């Protein structure tokens, strides 16, 4: 994929993601070891990563959803990101079920779990961030954590609508729009995503929200 993006001449910032724990949707065959993930990520960074501003390829690392992984691999992810000076990406507060899982198992909200595990700050950016309460909204702003809203995917999965006006008012500066992935959206058009984001926010938060 990285070679194909280079050949096409498009900007591509891939993330070496992983699953470290089996579940109903994660069979044992796709579970990665810490050594395998970190070794592969370092290989990709050394081969393709260009740290310069506006570069065409910057390689990152990150779990799909951090609190579904082992704490050991999350810690190793942060350590490697600091060592190689690369970004960390994943999903945060996408669904109500996700919030309920974190509250039940860890006794806190999703963004607070991320804070406790050093997963917020300039190095980090997360997709969705729908089900954040007021304190979490401010936490994202105070830590300068990046957010990427994925409205088409969120509508397909009935996940909800990202609180974009509240996040911007709170002071979130690193804000973008994403398409999520083929498993949750059948469109990879950024222009369509921008159009839908505008309409969804007007529907969700009012005609003066964007």
Task: Describe the function of each predicted region.
Residues 1-130, 135:
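Metal-coordinating catalytic core of metallo-dependent amide/deamination hydrolases
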Residues 132, 136-144, 150-156:
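Long hydrophobic segments that form regular secondary structure
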Residues 12, 88, 147, 174-175:
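Hydrophobic beta-strand scaffold residues
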Residues 126-129, 148, 176-179:
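Active-site neighborhood of phospho(di)ester-bond hydrolases with catalytic His/Asp-centered motifs
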Residues 17-19, 94, 151-155, 180-183:
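Short, acidic/turn-prone active-site loops that include or flank metal/cofactor-
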Residues 6, 82, 141, 168-169:
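Anion (oxyanion) recognition and catalysis
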Residues 96-108, 136-141, 158-167, 185-202:
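Histidine/acidic-residue-rich catalytic or RNA/ligand-binding cores of hydrolases
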Residues 116-123, 165-210:
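His/Asp/Glu-enriched, well-ordered alpha-helical/loop segment
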């Amino acid at each position: 994929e990285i070679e194909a993006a280079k050949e096409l001449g498009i900007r591509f910032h891939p993330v070496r993601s992983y699953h470290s724990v089996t579940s109903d949707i994660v069979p044992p065959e796709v579970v990665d070891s810490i050594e395998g993930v970190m070794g592969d990520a370092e290989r990709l960074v050394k081969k393709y990563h260009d740290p310069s501003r506006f570069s065409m390829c910057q390689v990152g690392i990150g779990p799909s959803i951090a609190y579904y992984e082992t704490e050991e691999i999350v810690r190793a992810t942060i350590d490697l990101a600091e060592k190689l000076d690369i970004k960390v990406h994943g999903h945060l507060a996408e669904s109500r079920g996700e919030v309920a899982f974190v509250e039940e198992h860890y006794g806190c909200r999703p963004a607070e779990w991320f804070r406790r595990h050093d997963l917020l700050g300039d190095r980090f950016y997360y997709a969705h961030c729908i089900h954040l309460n007021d304190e979490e909204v401010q936490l994202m702003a105070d830590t300068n954590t990046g957010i990427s809203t994925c409205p088409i995917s969120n509508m397909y999965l009935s996940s909800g609508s990202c609180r974009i006006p509240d996040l911007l008012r709170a002071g979130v500066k690193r804000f973008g729009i994403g398409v999520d992935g083929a498993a949750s959206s059948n469109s990879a058009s950024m222009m369509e995503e921008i159009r839908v984001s505008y309409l969804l926010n007007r529907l969700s938060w009012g005609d003066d929200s964007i």
